[in-house]
Amino acid sequence: MTLDALLQSLPPYAKDVRLNFSSLGREETLTAQQRDGLLVACGLASRNPDLARALEAEAAPRLSPAALAAAKAAATVMAMNNVYYRFTHLASNPAYATRPAKLRMSSIGNPGVARADFELWSLAVSAINGCGRCIDAHEQVLREAGVGEEAIQAAVRVAAVVASLAVALESVRAAA
């Protein structure tokens, strides 16, 4: 199903979701690659296959193969890291935070795109997955790279809208 068809399938109570999504395309603080990569990464992080396919179909033609792969890598490696580091952050035993993770994360070190773009995508996925430790780590890297608060907030806004779109689509499916 196309993105337009998914958006048209939203019920009246999801009007804000549809309007918020339409405003994402007018976001001026993000580059086109950042915005399109966010759509792909957040679509995957939403765990809604229909939405993930539609967002990738919408964004992929505007992304290089390397950027598309990096956006997917951000979603997949953050799925792992967000679980692991959220555990180390939330566990009552502080010893877990001092132990080595022993998890491969080579895509973080060599994402194939500008580091700031990959970090924005990772931050947004971390926001969807609710890992405060990862959010703080990615936000710090972005700020050190000179990325402004407006762009960081815009990336999280994309994540929030994609997450709400996934829930709205699930509500349609549940009612069917």
UniProtKB/Swiss-Prot annotation:
Signal peptide start and end residues: none
Domain of life: Bacteria
Protein EC: 1.11.1.28
Disulfide bonds: 131-134
SUPFAM superfamilies, alphabetized: AhpD-like
GO BP annotations listed: cell redox homeostasis; response to oxidative stress
Active site: 131, 134
UniProt keyword annotations, A-Z: Antioxidant, Disulfide bond, Oxidoreductase, Peroxidase, Redox-active center
Stated family: Belongs to the AhpD family.
General function of this protein: Antioxidant protein with alkyl hydroperoxidase activity. Required for the reduction of the AhpC active site cysteine residues and for the regeneration of the AhpC enzyme activity.
Protein name, as recorded: Alkyl hydroperoxide reductase AhpD
Organism annotation: Methylobacterium sp. (strain 4-46)
This protein's encoding gene: ahpD
